[in-house]
Amino acid sequence: MAFFKEFREFAMKGNVVDMAVGVIIGAAFGKIVSSLVADVIMPPLGLLIGGIDFKQFSLVLREAHGDIPAVILNYGAFIQTVFDFAIVAFAIFCAIKLINKMRRQEEEQPKAPPAPSAEETLLTEIRDLLKNQQK
């Protein structure tokens, strides 16, 4: 029973939960970026360079013979995946840069001086009383 209690405490720690949320959001973000590259960026890019569909780029290493399928190197899909990676890496870079900038701004803000301790307050009152007596 102690094993499950220890596992539950581990799983409920803030860092583990935050990481799980990040992984789930990252997976969804990856799908969005893949669609952006495949459906928005690559078609106009292919059109600009002569109506080329990058997904169709391939090199046949061995033709199909009977029941043996062809061996094909689909480097067009690889090019598209490289674009996916570049966009994801750029988006993560921008997000981390923004987060670091916000952290630096928080650190640069001057912190309010700590409230005087009870001893300091008492000494201040004594000082003020002594000043008033001297007048």
Swiss-Prot record:
Its main location: membrane. Homopentamer. It is a multi-pass membrane protein. The lineage of its organism: Bacteria, Pseudomonadati, Pseudomonadota, Gammaproteobacteria, Enterobacterales. Channel that opens in response to stretch forces in the membrane lipid bilayer. May participate in the regulation of osmotic pressure changes within the cell. Belongs to the MscL family. GO terms for molecular function: mechanosensitive monoatomic ion channel activity. GO terms for cellular component: plasma membrane. The gene is mscL. The chain crosses the membrane at residues 10-30, 76-96. Gene3D superfamilies: Large-conductance mechanosensitive channel, MscL, domain 1 (1.10.1200.120). Keywords: Cell inner membrane, Cell membrane, Ion channel, Ion transport, Membrane, Transmembrane, Transmembrane helix, Transport. HAMAP family: MscL. The keyword Transport applies. This is Large-conductance mechanosensitive channel. It is found in: Cell inner membrane.
